[in-house]
């Protein structure tokens, strides 16, 4: 039997993957590490991480407000965590590179976690009269997709499906519906709540929750964050400015720019 001269090439370049991982900004790295840590903690059988940190409407009270921040970091099983990490990393990395590390911390520990949770609790508990617990970083995935969809809509209002032109801002809604249909045990309401907040973020309505750049620069200078923290993204290192977006193409006839369907990307579940 003949011995092959060489192994078949890998479907990805390990060197490029390693280079990409080494360039990840600070907050993105910390989020990935916390998700991994919670998954490892869930492997033990003494204490249930999911029961402790999930977003469970009937469990929210004065002493359990931490759930509004812990649920995006917790996952049910390796596959749930792994796929969400793959989908979240490029989106979160881009956000931090565009807006800075301190802004990313302020938003994701604050309104970008608590606002989707608030909508979910309001509808799930007081309208649907249910108590379904949800966990998973897909809340941030759909939120960032919603924000990106709004920014894309401003420069490329439509994508073409045959002869039909569909607004690009609807793409996260299609993704949400498809995930709910084809991926079991997902929370359509949780994903939809995240998309709504993502739309508000993309439209600029959440600017009020972002600390002024003057204050951010003072904190960075006072603590020397850029010099002390590796991979820290300062206010002055931001890629596109706070809420700006660079146009990717010249204007088409009639002001409409088609966007390929590949914009939909990869999305995964929110919930056990």
From Swiss-Prot:
GO cellular component: a single term: membrane
Sorted UniProt keywords: Hydrolase, Membrane, Protease, Serine protease, Transmembrane, Transmembrane helix
Key word Transmembrane present: yes
Gene3D superfamilies: Rhomboid-like
Recorded phenotype for the gene knockout or disruption: Impairs growth under hypoxic conditions and leads to increased azole drug susceptibility, reduced siderophore production, and full loss of virulence in a murine model of invasive pulmonary aspergillosis (IPA).
Catalytic activity entry: Cleaves type-1 transmembrane domains using a catalytic dyad composed of serine and histidine that are contributed by different transmembrane domains
EC number in record: 3.4.21.105
Enzyme class at the top of the EC tree: hydrolase
Topology of this chain in the membrane: Multi-pass membrane protein
Function: Rhomboid protease that catalyzes intramembrane proteolysis. Required for transcription factor srbA activation by mediating its release from the membrane and thereby regulating its activity under hypoxic conditions. Essential for iron homeostasis and resistance to azoles such as voriconazole. Required for virulence in murine models of invasive pulmonary aspergillosis (IPA).
PANTHER family (UniProt xref): RHOMBOID PROTEIN 2, RHOMBOID-RELATED PROTEIN
Family per similarity comment: Belongs to the peptidase S54 family.
Protein's name according to its UniProt entry: Rhomboid-type serine protease B
Gene assigned in the entry: rbdB
């Amino acid at each position: 039997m003949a011995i092959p001269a060489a192994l078949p090439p890998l479907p990805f370049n390990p060197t490029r993957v390693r280079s990409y991982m080494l360039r990840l900004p600070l907050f993105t790295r910390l989020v990935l590490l916390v998700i991994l840590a919670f998954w490892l903690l869930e492997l033990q059988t003494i204490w249930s991480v999911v029961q402790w940190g999930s977003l469970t409407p009937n469990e929210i009270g004065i002493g359990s407000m931490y759930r509004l921040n812990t649920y995006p970091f917790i996952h049910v099983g390796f596959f749930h965590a792994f796929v969400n990490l793959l989908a979240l990393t490029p989106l979160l990395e881009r956000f931090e590179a565009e807006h800075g590390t301190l802004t990313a911390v302020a938003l994701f520990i604050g309104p970008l976690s608590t606002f989707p949770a608030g909508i979910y609790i309001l509808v799930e508990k007081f309208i649907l009269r249910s108590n379904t617990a949800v966990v998973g970083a897909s809340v941030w995935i759909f939120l960032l997709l919603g924000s990106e969809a709004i920014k894309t809509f401003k420069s490329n209002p439509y994508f073409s499906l045959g002869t039909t032109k569909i607004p690009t801002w609807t793409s996260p809604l299609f993704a949400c519906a498809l995930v709910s249909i084809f991926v079991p045990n997902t929370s359509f309401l949780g994903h939809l709540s995240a998309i709504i907040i993502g739309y508000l973020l993309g439209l600029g309505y959440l600017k009020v929750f972002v600390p002024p750049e003057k204050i951010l620069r003072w904190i960075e200078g006072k603590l020397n964050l850029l010099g002390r923290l590796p991979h820290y993204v300062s206010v002055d290192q931001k890629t596109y400015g706070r809420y700006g977006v660079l146009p990717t193409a010249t204007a088409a006839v009639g002001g409409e720019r088609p966007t390929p369907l590949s914009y939909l990307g990869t999305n995964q579940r929110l919930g056990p």
